[in-house]
From Swiss-Prot:
This is RNA-binding protein 1. The keyword Mitochondrion does not apply. InterPro entries: Nucleotide-bd_a/b_plait_sf, RBD_domain_sf, RRM_dom, SRSF. Pfam families: RRM_1. It comes from Drosophila melanogaster (Fruit fly). The gene is Rbp1.
Length: 144
């Protein structure tokens, strides 16, 4: 079986927020309903996520739409098309970078311009946290 990083990214699905006792068998059972599987890999250290590779890209997309937010292995799971270095980003494909949960598309270095890259950075000054019995968000000033 190939290492999970060598799987076909067009057919690879990221499964997040899995319980620590999630088994390969349970995940196979949930995902095989959408099409034939090539590989299933469940993280053990740290636990909480898995990758599932389908034979066909369309089955992976169907499973992603159907299973995202459903309960599996005792928790409500997050299911997304996986992303990685070998995915063709020129077509605008992307996704989460794994456990970050951002769900944002990533911009490749070649697609960035100096103005785009520098406009994404801000100076944050005067961070203040007020004491309270209830957690309060930090207040800050942005200087553009």
């Amino acid at each position: 079986m190939p290492r999970y990083r060598e799987w076909d990214l067009a057919c690879k699905v990221y499964v997040g927020n899995l319980g620590s006792s999630a088994s390969k068998h349970e995940i196979e059972g949930a995902f095989a309903k959408y099409g034939p599987l090539r590989n299933v890999w469940v993280a053990r250290n740290p636990p909480g996520f898995a990758f599932v590779e389908f034979e066909d890209r369309r089955d992976a997309e169907d499973a992603t739409r159907a299973l995202d937010g459903t309960r599996c292995c005792g928790t409500r799971i997050r299911v997304e098309m996986s992303s990685g270095r070998s995915r063709d980003r020129r077509r605008g494909e992307g996704g989460s970078s794994g456990r970050s949960g951002s769900g944002r598309y990533r911009i490749t270095p070649s697609a960035r311009t100096t103005s785009t890259a520098t406009s994404s950075f801000y100076n944050i000054n005067n961070l203040q946290q007020q004491p309270s019995s209830q957690p309060q968000p930090a207040t800050f000033n942005l200087q553009l």
